[in-house]
């Protein structure tokens, strides 16, 4: 979509989101929405998995209709769930932040598509700090430990290494 201008909003001041309360995550996400709407964004994609899991429904159902009804807001959960459900046969592991696991969004959405799937949600609180601290050896070890537990594994966290 080269005909569009893009704005990247990265909330580095409040990271990581995974250990925050749902109220904090919603507040941070609403702040981002207001900023992006003030910049005349017509489409906003919440690329943070935790913010999508915790705040997207509220934003789509309550905030946007009142505050900016012409704006479309999407997240990362539904596209991922659609692919995972198509590829999974019996059991899926969801490895994510504590806040994402608490939301049960992946379990709910996967069961809408395939109610027979067995889904295990696992919080990975050590993974984000390992990546943010550039400890890629530890991050790789943790990912392997989580992934080895499941035939189908969804790994959900989007931290960035810190300089």
Give names to the regions the model predicted.
Residues 1-32, 98-139:
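N-terminal glycine-rich anion-binding loop in soluble enzyme alpha/beta folds
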Residues 27-40, 141-153:
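Short, well-structured alpha-helical segments in soluble
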Residues 156-163:
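Conserved small/polar residues in nucleotide/adenosyl-binding loops
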Residues 53-87:
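Glycine/small-residue-rich loop that forms an oxyanion/phosphate-binding "nest" at active or ligand-binding sites
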Residues 1, 49-54, 97-102, 158:
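Gly/Ser/Thr-rich loops at beta-strand to alpha-helix junctions
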Residues 31, 36-57:
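Beta-alpha junction/loop-to-helix N-cap segments that form part of ligand/metal-binding clefts
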Residues 27-37, 73-91, 100:
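Hydrophobic alpha-helical segments within soluble ligand-binding/sensing domains
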């Amino acid at each position: 979509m080269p005909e569009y201008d893009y704005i990247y909003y990265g909330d580095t001041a409040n990271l990581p989101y995974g250990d925050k309360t749902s109220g904090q995550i919603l507040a941070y996400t609403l702040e981002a929405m207001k900023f992006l709407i003030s910049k005349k964004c017509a489409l906003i994609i919440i690329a943070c998995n935790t913010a999508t899991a915790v705040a997207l429904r509220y934003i789509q159902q309550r905030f946007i209709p009142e505050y900016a009804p012409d704006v479309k807001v999407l997240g990362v959960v539904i596209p991922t769930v659609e692919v995972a459900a198509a590829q999974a046969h019996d059991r899926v592991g969801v490895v994510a932040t504590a806040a994402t696991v608490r939301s049960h969004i992946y379990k709910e959405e996967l069961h809408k598509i395939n109610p027979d799937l067995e889904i295990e949600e696992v919080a990975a609180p050590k993974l984000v700090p390992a990546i943010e601290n550039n400890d890629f050896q530890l991050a790789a070890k943790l990912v392997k430990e989580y992934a080895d537990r499941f035939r189908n594994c969804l790994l959900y966290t989007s931290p960035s290494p810190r300089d």
